[in-house]
């Protein structure tokens, strides 16, 4: 099966890790995410509790791919993603189907910083 891949400026081709069967993808640009502040006090009377606001950003991963009809791709974090980068995926699993295949349909990761 052949799959068309379009690289965007600064993007890298998905790479198969020599120890596994999955593709690794890489951020195309530097993205700064602000993590919520630690030290929120929780008391029974709730007077000193404040909301913790999490921000998310879409991180471009540098390519578009033409998925064949009837197939889909899943973007999943590696088990080391949080340890290395302090982020989680906002939607936990990014699912991309064959309809997302236009020239400007760059794949992105919805990321939330926790630290």
Regions found by a protein language model. Give the residues of each.
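DUTPase catalytic domain/fold
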Residues: 1-115
């Amino acid at each position: 099966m052949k799959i068309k891949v379009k690289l965007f400026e600064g993007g890298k081709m998905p790479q198969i890790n020599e120890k596994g069967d999955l593709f690794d993808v890489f951020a195309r640009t530097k993205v700064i995410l602000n993590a919520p502040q630690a030290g929120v006090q929780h008391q029974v009377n709730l007077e000193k509790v404040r909301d913790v606001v999490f921000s998310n950003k879409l991180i471009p991963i540098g390519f578009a791919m033409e998925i064949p009809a009837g197939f889909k791709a899943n973007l999943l974090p590696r088990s080391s993603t949080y340890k290395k980068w302090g982020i989680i995926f906002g939607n936990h699993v990014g699912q991309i189907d064959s309809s997302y295949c236009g020239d400007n349909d760059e794949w992105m990761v919805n990321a939330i910083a926790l630290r």
